[in-house]
Amino acid sequence: MKRRLDDQESPVYAAQQRRIPGSTEAFSHQHRVLAPAPPVYEAVSETMQSATGIQYSVAPNYQVSAVPQSSGSHGPAIAAVHSSHHHPTAVQPHGGQVVQSHAHPAPPVAPVQGQQQFQRLKVEDALSYLDQVKLQFGSQPQVYNDFLDIMKEFKSQSIDTPGVISRVSQLFKGHPDLIMGFNTFLPPGYKIEVQTNDMVNVTTPGQVHQIPTHGIQPQPQPPPQHPSQPSSQSAPTPAQPAPQPTAAKVSKPSQLQAHTPASQQTPPLPPYASPRSPPVQPHTPVTISLGTAPSLQNNQPVEFNHAINYVNKIKNRFQGQPDIYKAFLEILHTYQKEQRNAKEAGGNYTPALTEQEVYAQVARLFKNQEDLLSEFGQFLPDANSSVLLSKTTAEKVDSVRNDHGGTVKKPQLNNKPQRPSQNGCQIRRHSGTGATPPVKKKPKLMSLKESSMADASKHGVGTESLFFDKVRKALRSAEAYENFLRCLVIFNQEVISRAELVQLVSPFLGKFPELFNWFKNFLGYKESVHLESFPKERATEGIAMEIDYASCKRLGSSYRALPKSYQQPKCTGRTPLCKEVLNDTWVSFPSWSEDSTFVSSKKTQYEEHIYRCEDERFELDVVLETNLATIRVLEAIQKKLSRLSAEEQAKFRLDNTLGGTSEVIHRKALQRIYADKAADIIDGLRKNPSIAVPIVLKRLKMKEEEWREAQRGFNKVWREQNEKYYLKSLDHQGINFKQNDTKVLRSKSLLNEIESIYDERQEQATEENAGVPVGPHLSLAYEDKQILEDAAALIIHHVKRQTGIQKEDKYKIKQIMHHFIPDLLFAQRGDLSDVEEEEEEEMDVDEATGAPKKHNGVGGSPPKSKLLFSNTAAQKLRGMDEVYNLFYVNNNWYIFMRLHQILCLRLLRICSQAERQIEEENREREWEREVLGIKRDKSDSPAIQLRLKEPMDVDVEDYYPAFLDMVRSLLDGNIDSSQYEDSLREMFTIHAYIAFTMDKLIQSIVRQLQHIVSDEVCVQVTDLYLAENNNGATGGQLNSQTSRSLLESAYQRKAEQLMSDENCFKLMFIQSQGQVQLTVELLDTEEENSDDPVEAERWSDYVERYMSSDTTSPELREHLAQKPVFLPRNLRRIRKCQRGREQQEKEGKEGNSKKTMENVESLDKLECRFKLNSYKMVYVIKSEDYMYRRTALLRAHQSHERVSKRLHQRFQAWVDKWTKEHVPREMAAETSKWLMGEGLEGLVPCTTTCDTETLHFVSINKYRVKYGTVFKAP
């Protein structure tokens, strides 16, 4: 996982850059720095990145209040409102307990001129809070409705803000997380706190109330110590000694939520390990806070229930059209992504989607919905303007954010009272002596580009402006300069101390000593003498920024060599061995997984989330172990001091390691707690350990308890989040499978697939000048016939619930799935007498007329005894092997068969996976029983015993039936797709993705079936198959396929004529060795008639010569002379007979010919046809020629013996002659011995006999070998 540069070191070192809430001394005297920068700054992100990519951490727990609301109305609003306070020593997290720390007098604050605003929350906060309420009270819908009624009453001004707080507190009694979460939507000055005794404290402007079970009762409370502080601030605690300041309390684990919605902050981490990003949400919430609504007076934000009601209105309006709602979300998310890109680019990026385009797309989406469109316009006030970054600027002008989402005030441009610095000098402010007059509200907010540096510099002093100009020129990067200004912004907001500011800007100004010294003098900063003895860390960080590593020497892809001109930093602790073996030349440039161009190698969002959890867990562990190591060292010192006398204790001193082995570890542990005062604490430990060690040790142990308690809470959150995303992180294919599979299952994609294969064959044949190869274009397999029943059951289940399909069509579909398809696939037929549909399928008969009632204007369904798709010939082939079925289909039938095969294949894969898991489970239990001697139940696995996994409601043996039930529930809409996918992942892990689109697949199949039973051409295709099936032209055994070639050719011609306007596919279902193979071939049905006159003349001449048996073309004579296709002796006999007939006709002897023809029966009805496009001759079915002599069989029996002996004598005479010439007597004798098995060694013991027999009137020698019993050697 890609780590930040500052995270690659131990988190202990990062503590120097972070402000610890428990330490407040550093804020007692601080200056403000005014930079001549544009008045709009980008939100301060978690890390501030310089121009070269080096990033610097910002304190994660700081949260500075926004400008309070000046409106007279106080009530819940979508805004992240916190108390205005100049010393953010206490942070009130959402859902956490009150955090207290030292209180210090606040400097006077000048009144803010003009209308004041508070930061607006996104609509996700409201939606997530509603989702949490809905989840909490899932079994009590009335509570959720009452909450919405309270919000509506407040909107109508029926109740005030205290009334809302009282009613919400009573409604959510017993749920402190919901009550505390409601603080997010309260105006400034109001705060709700839940006590341990279930009492609710409500802080209102001026006093604090307690809400008992019956309402609000004012309770006397001490007045606030600081009038300038809003009363929502926690009561200050008495001041404590400086060496032991009070640290911020960490939220208790009971307040940590198992599933943190987007609207709630993750429980506040200590300053060591704050989660850097919210958890990945499976469903992105709706965000419609695109701009400031012009219809809301005084620039009020969009109200809580206004946004909720609008979103709910869209959901309800398009309840039957979920695609519109999804498209609406997609438009908003695309717009927000563009705005984020524009914000990150700093004004150098033009969004591809403007507000005008957003409004236009929503207008097209909400056509004829004027009320929704007009209401949406409230969220896009500048839809008709051309401001590039209106939304981004509006958010930036209001505030900048730290990494916890807290609101940080914008730098004020009005005069502030000057405060004396530590060295007595004063910091000059903007010119002017009084408050500036109110600024009139402009119709549009200025964009970032409209505010120039020159305008901003008018408010600065010449020396300061000159300094910032030098800094901008020295940094030579706009991004680095903006990061430098961000440091000043958060210092002006008193988020960081002066020392931390100097440390943050040192990477920018460290390599410019003159500017850096001027800046430190301007701040009045003096380095502490106690810290001079410690080595400076990262002193050469600025130097690394000047090196151009792209031009340096490379070693592989991960290392760069430092240039020779680079001056190595001095190191006094190196030995000669260190100088010999340590690397000072090569710098590591690793290749991160996120930088890969291959999508398959990148981590998914769920993997990234788990990696972040592990990073946070690691950082927290490092901090805890560092603190524990320091505790052990100090305990050892305390034990040693207890054995010393008072005089020895007074003389006892510690070195820089504080009694341990490392200077850095213990110093970082103390700096994490005492912050700026850590140097004094360390100095006290070294000089006076007898007094300082017990105090510091007590402090460390207290923090150890707090952090351990926080760790337990975080472990719960991390565990739940890991469980939520663990299975998704393993599934790499499921993320993109749904989107890609939807495209694959489209009818157009299936047709394009086979058409592209057909075109490739045609092009290949054209290039090679060869004939087009004949054969199937696709070959698909049906591996298991049992799956056909499950596929048919799912399809019929969905068909039953389709109101758009007529009852008669449903019955036809049922017959196709239970009878017709199994017959094609040589499978067992299904049962049509479904008990579930007995009453539904029965014909409703009118009692008066006795005629079947009509449904939707169509006659009742046919009786069950009538089978519309009877295929008796195919049924006979079911139990045979090496058989086939032939089916010529159109587009709809082809698409249906493709989808049906995909469905069966996926069901088989899920079924096979379930069987494998059953086998693994059985093997594991068998191994535990035999090897470990443990016999456990099915639901008693080690993971469940250790509470690492929740017990499943379904046994492994029931996974496949449970999967089928879930598919039915998904088709019926009883479960949503996310719940369905999560359940599948839990059962089948990474193999579940193949079934994510099962509902879409079945719906596509049902649509094709509806076409098959209702479309005229599809019905004719089916009828043609059934008719040809009766003629024996649709299949049979493979070894007799040639005998049916004429019938199949006729079937093909009829199918091509029927489907002349669309594709014609030849489907062959071949059963071999128990498996069924489906082959698909796209036929060419286009006839291309030749217009060449030469070809036409040759064709006419060919037909004429063929019809006349007297003449033959010269080409044919020449071809027959070279390669005759008949026996020449037959030709001689025919010619001899012809000459004999001609001679008899001349002599007038007609009696013999008539007598010869009397005993002969003949038929001459053979017909043929020619295909004009290919000149191919095709014989007509049931036309034939034959000739038969009545006495031919009798005469053959009578002459059989004579003919057989004559032929044998002729053959024997030829053999004897050849043997006499080529075979000597010795060879003939050897042959006789070999036949009798004599004179050969190594033969199995046997006896050979020779008997003479007569076969077909001829004597033959019959040799018989009889083997003896073979005894094997022991």
From Swiss-Prot:
One Gene Ontology term of the molecular function aspect: chromatin binding
SMART domains membership: HDAC_interact (SM00761)
Modification(s) after translation: SUMO1 sumoylated by TOPORS. Probably desumoylated by SENP2.
Phosphoserine: modified positions: S10, S277, S833, S861, S941, S1090, S1113
A Pfam entry, by short name: PAH
Region of interest called Interactions with HDAC1 and ARID4B, as start-end residue ranges on this chain: 688-830
An example Gene Ontology biological process: negative regulation of transcription by RNA polymerase II
Compositional bias of kind Pro residues: 267-282
Primary localisation category: nucleus
The protein, known as: Paired amphipathic helix protein Sin3a
Source organism per UniProt: Mus musculus
